[in-house]
Amino acid sequence: MEIQFQQPNMQNQKAGISVTNKGGKFKGRNRNSNNTNKFVGVRQRPSGRWVAEIKDTTQKIRMWLGTFETAEEAARAYDEAACLLRGSNTRTNFITHVSLDSPLASRIRNLLNNRKGDKKQEDGAVASAPSNSKTTISNTSTITSNDDNKESTLSTCATRNTELFEDAYKPDLSNCKEVFESGSQSNISCGFGPFFDHFSFTQLLDMAKNDDITDASSLELSEFERMKVERQISASLYAINGVHEYMETVQESNEALWDLPPLCSLFC
């Protein structure tokens, strides 16, 4: 049995096939895969071409450097970009001398400038938010102050209007009683329409005196009638537009009662 098991091994030895050949094949594949990763920032596509790419986490930049025929060309492109972004002390694949006039250098400068511009815009937007709120508060206070000014202006105008009306002409009726008494002595009654009910002011007073009424209620009634007549006189005088027109209407009813020049001088 042992001879039979050894015969396949002998045949394999004669054929030159060893069991460890598979392991050697796998080792060879591992060597090839290691060769693809020996450069930093370089990877190979399925088509066989080489790609270079660089990332910078501090500045949040990821830049595509291009596709190359060989891994060395892709690695040198990565080294140049790394030196421009991170400085000469960064890790590189080769000893690299950076050219500031290369197309890659101009691309990286433009990328950095755009990144700085975007950052400034973001900072400006954040800073403008509090200023907008302050502007809104100031506008609100301005509107409030304007409303206060309007209210004060309206109150001032109302005060001035009140003063203006206080300065307006108001006829003095203190001597009206004497005029009516003098008119009653001459037995002339002045008819002022429905306001006086065809009775003069002095006749109402004489009726209360001559009747000798001792009842308190009757006295109160006569006093009420007297006040009513006085109010009617005041209302009629204020309703007439102009003292001159008022005097003309009175003069037409009884020219002998009124003396126009003395009354005008009294009111003036």
Curated annotation (Swiss-Prot):
Family annotation (Pfam families): AP2
Organism (species): Medicago truncatula
Regulation: induction: Induced in roots from 1 to 21 day after inoculation with Sinorhizobium meliloti. Induced by Nod factors in root hairs.
Composition-biased stretches (Low complexity): 131-146
SMART domains: AP2
Keyword Transcription: yes
Protein known as: Ethylene-responsive transcription factor ERN1
Subcellular location(s) per record: Nucleus
